[in-house]
A protein has these predicted regions:
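C-terminal catalytic core of tyrosine-transesterase DNA break-rejoin enzymes
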Residues: 26, 30, 36-37, 114, ...
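N-terminal core-binding DNA-recognition domain of tyrosine site-specific recombinases/integrases
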Residues: 14-19, 99-107, 124-129
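Catalytic-site neighborhood detector that most strongly recognizes the C-terminal catalytic loop/helix
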Residues: 57-61, 145, 152-177
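Mobile genetic element proteins and their domesticated derivatives, centered on retroelements
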Residues: 8, 112, 160-163
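Basic, Lys/Arg- and aromatic-enriched nucleic-acid-binding interface segment
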Residues: 1-35, 39, 59-62, 131
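Active-site/catalytic core of tyrosine-dependent DNA strand-transfer enzymes
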Residues: 5, 69-122
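A short, basic/aromatic helix-end/turn motif that makes direct DNA contacts
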Residues: 40-46, 128, 149-156, 164-166
């Protein structure tokens, strides 16, 4: 949920050692992108003046161009001040063998779980679900399929179907829309 994400970010951003972990999670959730792509994101992918992300996704090579919202922009400006001298947006905060490198998937997973525990989040939550959560929230908000696809990079509406959950919010929205159209008893 959005509250869980906020709780995670508050904890991660509150400590220097986990700030990059927080930024990776923030970007993945905000832009509904894969953690792996955010973990390897480079400054060249960001147009800070235009407040845009330009990304070629690793899985299917889809290209997306997404806006940078204010909260995320502020964190990126701060991160650029501290880490703009090297290529990665959210590297490990301490050099490894003299270089600032991106987190390995295994190290990211362990560090993310440590932040989740420190934030008091339930053990069943998984960082890998951030893309799904954000996409499901767009579906529930009534965002048109084409717009969702422009964010997620999907080229086929069938690929978005797994994100379309049978939830109370979506059922309520559908029945309310039907009623306002005058097609119920």
């Amino acid at each position: 949920s959005e509250d869980n994400v906020r709780q995670f970010l508050d904890r991660a951003y509150g400590m220097w050692g986990s700030r990059s972990i927080g930024l990776i999670v923030h970007m993945a959730y905000e832009w509904c992108q894969r953690l792996g792509d955010m973990r390897l994101l480079q400054w060249d992918n960001l147009d800070m003046d235009g407040r845009k992300l330009h990304l070629e996704q690793s899985k299917r090579r889809a290209e997306v161009c997404l806006p940078i919202e204010d909260d995320l922009y502020d964190m990126l400006v701060q991160q650029k001040e501290d880490f703009g001298f090297q290529a990665y947006v959210a590297p490990r905060v301490f050099p490894y063998r003299g270089e600032y490198r991106p987190y390995s998937l295994e190290r990211f997973s362990k560090a993310g779980r440590e932040v989740m525990r420190a934030a008091g989040l339930p053990e069943e939550l998984r960082l890998m679900d951030l893309r799904r959560t954000g996409t499901t929230q767009m579906v529930e908000a009534g965002v048109p399929m084409g717009q969702i696809m422009s964010v997620t990079g999907h080229s086929n509406p069938q690929s978005v179907k797994p994100y379309m959950k049978n939830t109370y919010a979506s059922a309520n929205s559908a029945l309310t829309a039907r009623k306002s159209y005058g097609k119920s008893t």
